[in-house]
Amino acid sequence: MAKYNVPADVPDELIDTFIDNMNAATAGTGRMNLFACDQKIEHLNDDFYDGGKKIPLSSNDPGHLFEIGNQCHQQGTIGVLAGQLGLIAQYARDYPEIPYLVKLNSKSHLVKTKQRDPVSQALWDMDDVMSLVHNGINVVGIGYTIYIGSEYEHEMMSEAAQLIRQAHELGMISVVWMYPRGAAVGNEKDPQLISGAAGVAACIGADFAKVNYPAEFEGMSLSLIHISE
């Protein structure tokens, strides 16, 4: 098993719980392969239905995500399934072995940046998350999206920071989706900007940062270029 850095806001009596959640989320490697299932809000139906042309009709059933997640978890190819609390609540009892990461905020893609800088506020709080835990759902942590560079970034950072602290106090892990976006952002894939966004995630206490793959940059290794292709 990997050795983890346990944040100081995790109570002493919950350190083992935090480590157990880390092991569950990373299969003991310290590296997370997250199965993101938050697109039902984020992308609406764009990724799930096209009349059967390229997307299988089975993909339009929300339960299909959990079938995939369960199979991949059994194979050891994913650590956690990340989704909104409501979606997890609907299906988790049928798939009790999957470790879940509850995504606390979300927004659709309908309002574009040219109309308004993005903002995504929490739809649930930690009491709601704990209600799932008390009902026997295998929740190991929380997730939150921050649009760094938005004029509303301070609102999202403040909310995320408090939720991360509360999650740690309960022995849970946290993942922050860090996406540069807004009128002030010239290039969302700029490597320096993405690196800075990851640093912001560290500063608000996140255990993991989910970022966009950066544009090619000087010194990029061939292995990374091959992955991007």
Where on the chain are the PLM-derived regions?
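N-terminal amphipathic alpha-helix/helix-capping segment at the start of soluble metabolic enzymes
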Residues: M1-D38, R93-Y95
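Short amphipathic alpha-helices and their capping/turn segments at secondary-structure boundaries
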Residues: I15-G28, I88-R93, D125-V133, E159-H168
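Conserved, mostly hydrophobic/aromatic
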Residues: F35, W177, A209
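Active-site beta-loop-alpha junctions enriched in small/polar residues
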Residues: D38-E42, Q84-I88, N105-H109, Y147-G149, ...
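Active-site beta->alpha loop and helix N-cap motifs at the rims of alpha/beta catalytic domains
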Residues: I55-S158, I173
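Conserved anion-binding
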Residues: N138-I204
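A mid-sequence, solvent-exposed acidic-amphipathic segment
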Residues: P191-G205, K210-V211, A215-L224
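Conserved small/polar residues in nucleotide/adenosyl-binding loops
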Residues: I225-E229
